[in-house]
Regions:
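Transmembrane beta-strands of outer-membrane beta-barrel pores
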Residues: 30-36, 70-76, 102, 109-113, ...
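Outer-membrane beta-barrel translocator/channel fold
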Residues: 35-38, 139-212, 238-252, 275-291, ...
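Surface-exposed loop and membrane-interface regions of Gram-negative outer-membrane beta-barrel proteins
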Residues: 37-50, 58-105, 111-121, 244-250, ...
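Residues that define the transmembrane beta-barrel architecture of outer-membrane proteins
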Residues: 42-52, 87-92, 120-125, 180-186, ...
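Outer-membrane beta-barrel architecture
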Residues: 53-57, 95-97, 128-130, 185-191, ...
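Repeated loop/turn-to-beta-strand initiation elements of outer-membrane beta-barrel proteins
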Residues: 62-68, 100-106, 135-140, 195-203, ...
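Extracellular/periplasmic loop regions
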Residues: 237, 246-319, 323-349
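Outer-membrane beta-barrel "beta-signal"
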Residues: 366, 393-407
Length: 407
């Protein structure tokens, strides 16, 4: 009986996963980062992180596919004498996909992002249905966040979530320190790549509900337009939010405008000028601070949450040679109220200034081989270029990242 059962199982697997339908991969990423306040090397902070990510893909008959990936990461902080080494396991993207002509079904742990990439962006557990038509593409999905790894989910909508988000994983209190806050979100999207032959359109309605016993819910109406011309790309987007908290409904706003100039060079290069805005609390409190579901870091040094902030940025991205590319950006940070953003460089004292300062950052990416990539980045944040806390220390950061891939 046991032999018969094993034989039937083998036949089922062979029929399900057709020949040459398997694929394995492995990625190892090693990061080293240091912060030097005011170029004082005696106050240098050093941080190391590595991530090992295996993946497996397979076809499920003629219409489906399976993707499984996981991650084991370690974090080390040599300056922390109490707990300088932590190993963290994680289930990353793991989903099944079935295609039935114009209808596509995706279920499991998947990546999702709103049209602007500022409200919800990352891994979520749930299902997504997509329909492709000649009039555009329609998607509808629902997801849950409470089983995600907290540090990857980056859900910090409330002050309690913000505080707990900075805690390290404690295996003696695993459930309270590992998992992300419990929230349910649902979204309906529409996009058309070329309306009238030249206009790209994306729009979505997204709602998130507190499933962890709290009472903070929010809804988002987002739209993004893209107009590609011969050597210029114009992007315009906006988000209208309703925040429900303690029985009160407050509107909030965000906007994103970008102008990208494609340079007439042999190797791809472009310059981008952009402005990103998120409302702060108005004086009469009729408008609230924009509150995204996930925290998408703004800047490479400040890594600010897009809430009550505006950013003006001028950046360059391009290939210097076939295996070598570079990025450089100048970003200026402005507060839109005096109470929402209370982090570096305004962590101490009362500040009446709105201008936080400027970040200058550059990165080199060297594709040494198809399976080895080296990233080197460095930059500074200069509070003296603003009036919020001009006497605060300059913060210098250096990042080194090496990625090894086996396909």
């Amino acid at each position: 009986m046991k032999k018969t059962l094993l034989l039937l199982t083998a036949v089922f697997l062979l029929r399900t996963f057709s020949l040459h339908a398997f694929d394995f991969g492995l990625v190892f990423s090693q990061d080293a980062e240091t912060d030097v306040p005011a170029f004082d090397f005696e106050r240098t902070g050093f941080y190391i992180k590595g991530v090992l990510t295996p993946r497996f893909t397979a076809r499920l008959g003629g219409k489906g596919s399976l993707y499984v990936s996981a991650a084991v990461s370690y974090e080390a902080d040599p300056s922390d004498e109490t707990d300088s080494f932590t190993v963290i396991p994680e289930l990353t993207r793991t989903d099944v996909n079935f295609n039935f002509g114009i209808i596509n079904l995706n279920a499991g742990r998947m990546f999702y992002g709103d049209p602007l990439g500022i409200t919800a962006d990352g891994l979520f557990d749930g299902a997504l249905v997509s329909v492709v038509t000649r009039f555009g593409n329609i998607r509808a999905g629902a997801w849950y966040t409470g089983l995600l790894y907290r540090d990857r989910a980056k859900i910090t909508m409330t002050s309690d979530e913000m505080e707990s988000g900075g805690e390290k994983v404690d295996y003696e209190n695993f459930a309270d320190t590992y998992f992300a806050p419990s929230r349910v979100l649902a979204a309906v999207e529409y996009d058309h790549p070329s309306l009238a032959g030249f206009l790209g359109l994306k729009a979505s309605i997204l709602a998130q509900f507190d499933a962890g016993g709290g009472n903070l819910n929010s809804q988002y109406l987002t739209a993004a337009l893209s107009v590609p011309l011969k050597s210029v790309i114009f992007d315009l987007g906006g988000c209208f939010e309703l925040i429900e908290y303690d029985g009160k409904v407050t509107p909030a706003f965000a906007a994103d405008i970008g102008l990208t100039f494609v340079l007439p060079t042999k190797l791809e290069k472009h310059i981008k000028l952009s402005w990103r805005y998120s409302s702060g609390v108005s004086e009469d409190e009729t408008v609230g601070a924009f509150l995204p579901l996930t925290t998408v870091p703004q800047g490479e040094i400040v890594e600010a949450k897009l809430s009550g902030l505006s950013l003006l940025s001028l950046g360059f991205t391009g290939r210097l040679a076939k295996p070598l590319s570079a990025e450089a950006a100048f970003t200026y940070f402005i507060r839109n109220d005096l109470g929402t953003y209370r982090y570096y460089p305004v962590t101490e004292g009362d500040s009446e200034g709105f201008f936080l300062g400027a970040e200058i950052y550059g990165r080199l990416v060297w594709n040494i081989t198809p399976g080895i990539r080296l990233n080197f980045g460095t930059g500074v944040f200069i509070p003296a270029l603003g009036d919020a806390m001009p006497e605060a220390d300059i913060l210098w950061r250096v990042k080194l990242n090496m990625v090894f891939s086996i396909f």
